[in-house]
């Protein structure tokens, strides 16, 4: 069955991170460019996959990639915080709600994303797995803009502080696996195995 497309909420793929813990052959590697399944990069995999669910997918990053897609460029070159991408997205897209997801969480199911996008009476609706809060796999409302501006002004880049100071709600999901974050090469290799298993299952 084809997924009904979410056409009233844009999806912003957060890809402006540092990849500081992602090391291949003793070299820090940009994980966005690691191949995944039949795709040339994690970036292409996530972008293509999310377009099956959202009418509009935009990539938030520090510089545009070869992948032909709409980009939101973060101006802060030496500072790495997803708050810049979230703030920039609201200023640029001028839309009440935006769904955010990091590039390095390729296993999140469409069911989970739809559940998060279905709860609209909070400033931030975020995913929570058995062991962790996932503040970046979340639906945000534009009424968080003042809090975002204040956090950036005071240089408090802790997402948890900002989310807890807004009217936020955690949606509990029981599968830890789908929220695997590809911080390291080991995480990436695990995700490759999981996707292989899913394809064969």
From Swiss-Prot:
Family per similarity comment: Belongs to the MobA family.
Domain notes for this protein: The N-terminal domain determines nucleotide recognition and specific binding, while the C-terminal domain determines the specific binding to the target protein.
Keyword terms: Cytoplasm, GTP-binding, Magnesium, Metal-binding, Molybdenum cofactor biosynthesis, Nucleotide-binding, Transferase
Record: residues binding Mg(2+): 104
Highest taxon listed in the record's lineage: Bacteria
PANTHER family: MOLYBDENUM COFACTOR GUANYLYLTRANSFERASE
Amino acids binding GTP: 14-16, 31, 104
GO molecular function, one term: GTP binding
GO BP terms in the entry: bis(molybdopterin guanine dinucleotide)molybdenum biosynthetic process
Cofactor annotation: Mg(2+)
Gene3D superfamilies named in the record: Spore Coat Polysaccharide Biosynthesis Protein SpsA, Chain A
E.C. no: 2.7.7.77
Annotated catalysed reactions: Mo-molybdopterin + GTP + H(+) = Mo-molybdopterin guanine dinucleotide + diphosphate
InterPro entries, per database record: MobA-like_NTP_Trfase (IPR025877), Molybde_CF_guanTrfase (IPR013482), Nucleotide-diphossugar_trans (IPR029044)
Subcellular location(s) per record: Cytoplasm
Protein source organism: Helicobacter pylori (strain ATCC 700392 / 26695)
Protein name per UniProt: Molybdenum cofactor guanylyltransferase
Cystines in this chain: none
Pfam families: NTP_transf_3 (PF12804)
Keyword Transferase (UniProt): yes
Function: Transfers a GMP moiety from GTP to Mo-molybdopterin (Mo-MPT) cofactor (Moco or molybdenum cofactor) to form Mo-molybdopterin guanine dinucleotide (Mo-MGD) cofactor.
Complex and partners: Monomer.
UniProt-listed CDD domains: MobA
Listed transmembrane segments: none
């Amino acid at each position: 069955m084809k997924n009904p497309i979410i056409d009233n909420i844009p999806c912003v793929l957060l890809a402006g991170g540092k990849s500081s813990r992602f090391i291949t052959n003793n070299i820090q590697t940009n994980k966005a460019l690691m191949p995944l399944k039949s795709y040339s990069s994690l970036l292409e995999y996530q972008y293509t996959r999310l377009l099956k669910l959202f009418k509009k997918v935009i990539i938030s990053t520090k510089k545009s990639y070869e992948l032909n897609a709409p980009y939101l460029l973060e101006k802060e070159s030496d500072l790495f915080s997803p708050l810049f991408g979230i703030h920039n997205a609201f200023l640029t897209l001028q839309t009440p709600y935006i769904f955010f997801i990091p590039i390095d969480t390729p296993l999140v199911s469409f069911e989970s994303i739809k559940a998060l996008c279905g709860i609209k009476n909070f400033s931030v609706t975020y995913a929570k797995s058995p062991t962790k809060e996932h503040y970046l796999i979340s639906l945000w409302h534009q009424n968080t803009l003042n809090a975002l501006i204040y956090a950036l002004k005071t240089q408090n880049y802790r997402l948890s502080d900002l989310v807890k100071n807004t009217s936020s709600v955690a949606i509990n999901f029981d599968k830890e696996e789908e929220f695997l974050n590809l911080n390291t090469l080991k995480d990436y290799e695990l995700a490759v195995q999981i996707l292989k298993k899913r394809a064969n299952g």
